[in-house]
């Protein structure tokens, strides 16, 4: 990770704020901090996430500023809307600094036991590989499907629905899935977009948990369809149309794989 990026963020928010980089993607760098964006710190146990979009030197400066502002504001607005959906679990938005390209959110998840990594769905399923069909795995994967169903039923799409972008929060013996990273998210009622979301997640499961992926996706889709079916005839009709398009997306993906 670039020391220049870390230095720039420290200059923006002050040397007194401790920012720990935890990951870097093509568009943004993710930090954790114990400093709230605007409230005085009284404890030190709370942790927050700062998603920072650094300037892109390959873009014209004025275009880069405009794009960064647009994408940062767009993601923050989307998170704000998603928080209003009953039952949908996403990070709580705390602050948005569009001029510096950063979003502050609540921190979700924990480190899994025995150094198994962070509690996203990918690492959780790896941790449970010795008992892949246990009740807790089945319940968790079904709940993931319910969360995606809620997202899609309300006409929102994730845009990058991988097992790394589903964080699990422990609640006793259970794990509650939360959807994170809506940088590519959108408000869309197109079955094509929803079908692509499902296909991306199916491929992610197949690539990282190939031995059990078929069963996992079956459970996931049972949770997903239950959301639509709970809305009666209208839900059944929308589900039928979505699943038909999902099969078309699947077929296109297989053809691309065959052609290399």
UniProtKB/Swiss-Prot annotation:
GO BP, sorted A to Z: positive regulation of transcription by RNA polymerase II; telomere maintenance via recombination; tRNA processing; tRNA threonylcarbamoyladenosine metabolic process
Any Pfam family matching the protein: Kdo
Family annotation (SUPFAM superfamilies): Protein kinase-like (PK-like) (SSF56112)
InterPro entries reported for this sequence: Bud32 (IPR022495), Kinase-like_dom_sf (IPR011009), Prot_kinase_dom (IPR000719), Tyr_kinase_AS (IPR008266)
Cellular location(s): Cytoplasm; Nucleus; Chromosome, Telomere
EC number: 3.6.-.-, 2.7.11.1
Residues reported to bind ATP: 22-30, 51
Catalytic activity line of the entry: L-seryl-[protein] + ATP = O-phospho-L-seryl-[protein] + ADP + H(+); L-threonyl-[protein] + ATP = O-phospho-L-threonyl-[protein] + ADP + H(+)
Keywords per UniProt: Activator, ATP-binding, Chromosome, Cytoplasm, Hydrolase, Kinase, Nucleotide-binding, Nucleus, Phosphoprotein, Serine/threonine-protein kinase, Telomere, Transcription, Transcription regulation, Transferase, tRNA processing
UniProt-annotated catalytic positions: 160
Domain Protein kinase intervals: 16-260
The UniProt record lists the keyword Iron: no
GO molecular function terms attached to this record: ATP binding; ATP hydrolysis activity; protein serine kinase activity; protein serine/threonine kinase activity
GO CC entries: chromosome, telomeric region; cytosol; EKC/KEOPS complex; nucleus
Notes on the domains: This protein is considered an atypical serine/threonine kinase, because it lacks the conventional structural elements necessary for the substrate recognition as well as a lysine residue that in all other serine/threonine kinases participates in the catalytic event. BUD32 has protein kinase activity in vitro, but in the context of the EKC/KEOPS complex, the catalytic subunit KAE1 switches the activity of BUD32 from kinase into ATPase.
Function summary: Component of the EKC/KEOPS complex that is required for the formation of a threonylcarbamoyl group on adenosine at position 37 (t(6)A37) in tRNAs that read codons beginning with adenine. The complex is probably involved in the transfer of the threonylcarbamoyl moiety of threonylcarbamoyl-AMP (TC-AMP) to the N6 group of A37. BUD32 has ATPase activity in the context of the EKC/KEOPS complex and likely plays a supporting role to the catalytic subunit KAE1. The EKC/KEOPS complex also promotes both telomere uncapping and telomere elongation.
Subunit structure: Component of the EKC/KEOPS complex composed of at least BUD32, CGI121, GON7, KAE1 and PCC1; the whole complex dimerizes.
Record family assignment: Belongs to the protein kinase superfamily. BUD32 family.
Protein name: EKC/KEOPS complex subunit BUD32
Gene source species: Eremothecium gossypii (strain ATCC 10895 / CBS 109.51 / FGSC 9923 / NRRL Y-1056) (Yeast)
């Amino acid at each position: 990770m670039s020391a220049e990026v870390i230095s720039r963020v420290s200059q923006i928010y002050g040397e007194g704020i401790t920012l720990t980089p935890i990951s870097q993607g093509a568009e943004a760098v993710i930090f954790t901090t114990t400093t709230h964006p605007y409230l005085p710190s009284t404890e030190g146990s709370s942790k927050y996430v700062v998603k920072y979009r650094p300037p892109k030197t390959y873009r014209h400066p004025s275009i880069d500023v405009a794009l960064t502002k647009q994408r940062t504001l767009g993601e923050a607005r989307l998170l704000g809307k998603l928080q209003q959906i009953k039952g949908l679990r996403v990070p709580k938005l705390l602050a948005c600094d569009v001029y510096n390209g950063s979003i502050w959110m609540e921190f979700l998840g924990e480190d899994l036991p025995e150094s198994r990594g962070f509690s996203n769905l990918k690492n959780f399923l790896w941790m449970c590989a010795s008992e892949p069909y246990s009740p807790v795995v089945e319940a968790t994967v079904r709940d993931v499907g319910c969360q995606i169903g809620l997202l899609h039923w309300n006409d929102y799409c994730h845009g990058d629905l991988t097992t790394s972008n589903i964080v699990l929060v422990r609640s006793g013996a259970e794990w509650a899935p939360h959807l994170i990273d809506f940088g590519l998210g959108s408000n869309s009622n197109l079955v094509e977009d929803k079908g692509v979301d499902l296909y991306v997640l199916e491929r992610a499961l197949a690539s990282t948990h190939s031995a059990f992926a078929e069963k996992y996706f079956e459970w996931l889709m049972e949770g997903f369809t239950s959301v639509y079916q709970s809305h009666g005839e209208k839900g059944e009709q929308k589900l039928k149309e979505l699943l038909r398009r999902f099969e078309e997306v699947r077929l296109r993906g297989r053809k691309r794989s065959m052609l290399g």
